[in-house]
Amino acid sequence: MAFEALTGINGDLITRSWSASKQAYLTERYHKEEAGAVVIFAFQPSFSEKDFFDPDNKSSFGEIKLNRVQFPCMRKIGKGDVATVNEAFLKNLEAVIDPRTSFQASVEMAVRSRKQIVFTGHSSGGATAILATVWYLEKYFIRNPNVYLEPRCVTFGAPLVGDSIFSHALGREKWSRFFVNFVTRFDIVPRITLARKASVEETLPHVLAQLDPRNSSVQESEQRITEFYTSVMRDTSTVANQAVCELTGSAEAILETLSSFLELSPYRPAGTFVFSTEKRLVAVNNSDAILQMLFYTCQASDEQEWSLIPFRSIRDHHSYEELVQSMGMKLFNHLDGENSIESSLNDLGVSTRGRQYVQAALEEEKKRVENQKKIIQVIQQERFLKKLAWIEDEYKPKCQAHKNGYYDSFKVSNEENDFKANVKRAELAGVFDEVLGLLKKCQLPDEFEGDIDWIKLATRYRRLVEPLDIANYHRHLKNEDTGPYMKRGRPTRYIYAQRGYEHHILKPNGMIAEDVFWNKVNGLNLGLQLEEIQETLKNSGSECGSCFWAEVEELKGKPYEEVEVRVKTLEGMLREWITAGEVDEKEIFLEGSTFRKWWITLPKNHKSHSPLRDYMMDEITDT
């Protein structure tokens, strides 16, 4: 029961997944099984070198960035970095989901029938299952999580597929819980992609042939197996040690020197890993801890054992049948740092140092959770919320009553309230910059970046306070000294807040903010090729409503002919910004606002055809 509560799968589903994974060896691409309310898709593994490291990929680890259009969630929202995956595994997925196969139609049928879908596979078939699950989540589940059933991904001895961003994105979207990866203690396959291609290229073809269960037996005297195992674990050791140094903030001089010129594998564990020993199953869902365990569970206790482990690493890849059959007789431990981890790690042969590193990874996650709690305590405090409320409910309305709005009032800063607003602006910036610092250093849980309450607060803050930052920037003439606000002055806290909001509202449609923006611009019929428009709008403020005033400031000092495309783009975006709450309609059309004063100077022909003419009818009539 504890296992099912943690992973969402029971023994029967695991048994059926393994059975389907075996059947996939006999099919081309994938095998489908259906029983009751569950449909299982099992993927055929390959033991060809090209299906582990794509021969056309020249990088040291065969990696490639995911397509942002096809996988819009698989990135860091704030920084915008896209997840990296193994290209050979990705090509296997692309071959499966090719419209010429029956796979997509079969998935569609299961979706319409409201059946739970399980993706599974052994070895590299498990890698395909992982990517197929992400494909399903992006294509179906994210559109309406209340309608589409949660998928499950169950793998047996699968290699690592994606990088830390891949793992982070799954955590942020709360998808990590859908992935359960079974690993026997010495199985080499989950460690293979931690090695450089150059380290294993000579021995990999032979070892893959030995890993194929359709081969008769492992050649235990084969020196190439020992060479392969040694190379993989040497690179795994470097990756694990570098990772723990980054995690704890310590630095071993030799590792610092190594990392400066030696490329390290980008691949990292994702989801829940279930390590198996003779006595127990040990479940871990902390990616940093799993990485350490992939190295330290594969170590020998003495010289005699060391000589046997390379061949055990092959045999263990063939032992998942035994694992599945014996699950009901084994103890179950969840390695979360709350309970004693000694017995679990002892069974897995983890050394004292290894236990320290695993514990450090678990403790680091606790610190992330504590950091999040502290942030929540701060932003829920009455004095914090009062700062936002004062700007929103007192300062802004009083400025609007004077017919010039809070942007223009703050830009001049002649009143005592303007000074008070500046103090509150600085105090709020301090809080949000502290959060940003924690995000950049990965010192918050993955889920935080996608937390709806945080996104709402950050959006409220951005919409309300960024105009004050823009006013302050131009009041001090920084645009003349430093350059345009959008190019040189925009604080990162607003960029992160903007991207978080855009991701939240667009992900149900599987869309990317950048593409949505350019589609809107293209629909404005500006009379230029899109490439020309993109060059013209580079670093403009038309991509975000809270940057409205920055764009106005840039446009008002330039001849209309020079900025016509930017003017029309700004006008074309404005109505939607007003509807969405990005721009305050009452603020920008006030009699004394910078925007209104600038707009009335535009050519009469432009004004008479402007989408804003209804708002500015008096000005058009007067001119």
UniProtKB/Swiss-Prot annotation:
Entry GO MF terms: hydrolase activity
Keywords from the UniProt entry: Acetylation, Cytoplasm, Endoplasmic reticulum, Hydrolase, Microsome, Nucleus, Plant defense
Mutagenesis or variant effect for residue 189 to M: No effect on basal resistance
Comment field on protein domains: The N-terminal domain (1-384) is necessary and sufficient for interaction with SAG101.
Residue positions, PTM N-acetylalanine: 2
Protein name: Protein EDS1L
Matching Pfam families: EDS1_EP, Lipase_3
Subcellular location: Nucleus; Cytoplasm; Microsome
Induction notes from the record: Up-regulated by salicylic acid or upon avirulent bacterial pathogen infection.
Subunit structure: Homodimer. Interacts with RPS4, RPS6, SNC1, SRFR1, AvrRps4 and HopA1. Interacts with PAD4 (via N-terminus). Interacts with SAG101. EDS1-SAG101 and EDS1-PAD4 form separate complexes in pathogen-unchallenged cells.
Any GO CC annotation of this UniProt entry: nucleus
GO biological process, alphabetically ordered: defense response; lipid metabolic process
InterPro entries reported for this sequence: AB_hydrolase_fold, EDS1-like, EDS1_EP, Fungal_lipase-type
Active-site residues, as the UniProt record annotates them: 123, 187, 317
Function: Positive regulator of basal resistance and of effector-triggered immunity specifically mediated by TIR-NB-LRR resistance proteins. Disruption by bacterial effector of EDS1-TIR-NB-LRR resistance protein interactions constitutes the first step in resistance activation. Triggers early plant defenses and hypersensitive response independently of PAD4, and then recruits PAD4 to potentiate plant defenses through the accumulation of salicylic acid.
Primary subcellular site in the record, as a coarse category: nucleus
